A protein has these predicted regions:
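Bacterial Sec-dependent N-terminal signal peptides
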Residues: 1-24
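Intrinsically disordered, low-complexity terminal tails/loops enriched in metal-binding residues
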Residues: 18-65
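Extended, subdomain-level signal for the structured scaffold at the beginning of enzyme domains
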Residues: 59-162, 169-177, 204, 221, ...
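Residues that mark the start of a beta-strand
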Residues: 70-72, 182, 213
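Flexible, surface-exposed loop/linker segments and immediately adjacent secondary-structure boundaries
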Residues: 167-168, 187
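A conserved active-site-flanking secondary-structure segment within enzyme catalytic domains
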Residues: 179-205
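Conserved Rossmann-fold dehydrogenase catalytic segment
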Residues: 203-215, 248-249
């Protein structure tokens, strides 16, 4: 009897241990990227099959992304600010659904390049906390030597990323944020940055430099590249490509900068194998045809419909996704030759490869 009780106790402990092990198994999710995959749950680590973002555990999701929390980005605007410096990135972050607000030293209106009047949302006295601080060029040498502004930058708690465009880099340089890091700026300001801030390694031929949590860009239009890069880091490369397409900035060359960060949003996208196997002419809707060709600049595919190029975003082998979020799966025969594709919108239909 005693032996039986010991045996039953042993079985119970095994059962409890097994149950504990089952309960300890983590579910994995995609970091919020404002796509349908935000609600998909995965049973093992890896990348999202929809947007290709690295998966995180549900515990990490709750900790890093409180429910319905949008990333807040503060655009610091000074008198004389360069319009495209801030307007280009603002467009990118707006498409990415960031919560954007403007800050200046005071709430008085400022003039940008002598032509645009701007009324800031906040002054440095009443600005709310942000997740990202962004600074831009134009009259930067004078503005970013102001001790009140530098003190405000240094006093901001819980900043996740610092971002600068053009000579906005001097805000971060004067605040000490870039000490020991690598940076770039507007071409005419590179020598001054290198001479006056020896603690910063200055790069003279890069669209942007990513130190991990601090991103600096070259002048004016390069701010768009840097903003797309930050979106790629936070929401996935495919989301950044969609935004570039919608802005008709689809001549963007992804990753055309220096990435010193441990997280590279372009991993797995720059060397997609055998792209040429998918090219050709296929059947399409309403007895029309679609031509698939290589987009060599982005190392991906274009679908040509009615003479317009529509990007297809790579997910994994034989699987892409279009602008509408439809998954495109290429079907192969026994000899590993592509014979057509199926769309998740109507998976029963095989669109045959014609040539």
């Amino acid at each position: 009897m005693k032996t039986l009780l010991v045996f039953l106790s042993f079985l119970t402990s095994i059962s409890l241990h097994s149950q504990s092990s089952i309960n300890a198994i983590d579910n994995y999710v995609c970091p919020p990227c404002n796509s349908s995959c935000d609600t998909i749950i995965f049973d093992k680590p890896g990348t999202c099959t929809h947007c290709a973002m690295p998966l995180i555990t549900e515990k990490e999701l709750k900790k890093k992304y409180p429910k319905n929390k949008k990333r807040k980005i503060a655009f610091y605007l000074q008198p004389g600010i360069e319009i495209l410096d801030f307007a280009g990135p603002m467009e990118v972050f707006a498409y990415a659904d960031f919560e954007i607000f403007t800050v200046s030293k005071t709430k008085e209106s400022i003039i940008s390049q002598g032509i645009l009047t701007i009324l800031p949302d906040y002054s440095i006295q009443d600005a709310p906390e942000a997740d990202i601080l962004a600074f831009f060029g134009g009259n930067a040498a004078q503005s970013f030597k102001d001790p009140e502004i530098i003190k405000w930058i240094q006093s901001q708690p819980n900043i996740e990323y610092h971002f600068s465009v053009c000579t906005g880099v001097f805000a971060l340089a004067n605040a000490g944020t870039l000490n020991g890091m690598t940076a770039t700026t507007f071409h005419n300001a590179l020598d001054g940055l290198e001479k006056n801030y020896p603690e910063i390694t200055v790069v003279k031929d890069a669209r942007f430099v990513d130190n991990g949590k601090v991103i600096t860009t070259a002048g004016i239009s390069a701010g768009i590249d840097g903003a797309l890069h930050l979106v790629a880091k936070l929401q996935g490369f495919n989301e950044a490509r969609k935004i570039a397409y919608h802005m008709e900035y689809d001549k963007w060359t992804p990753g055309e900068g220096i990435n010193l960060s441990l997280d590279n949003p372009y991993d797995g996208f720059t060397n997609i194998p055998n792209l040429e196997n998918y090219t050709g002419t296929y059947e399409y809707l309403d007895n029309t045809e679609v031509i698939l060709k290589i987009n060599s600049r982005e190392k991906s595919l274009y679908a040509v419909v009615y003479k317009r190029n529509y990007p297809l975003f790579y997910l994994k082998k034989d699987k892409f996704i279009n602008l509408n979020g439809d998954e495109i799966t290429f079907i192969k025969d026994d000899n590993n030759r592509v014979i057509g594709f199926r769309s998740s919108r109507n998976y029963d239909t095989l669109y045959k490869k014609l040539k």
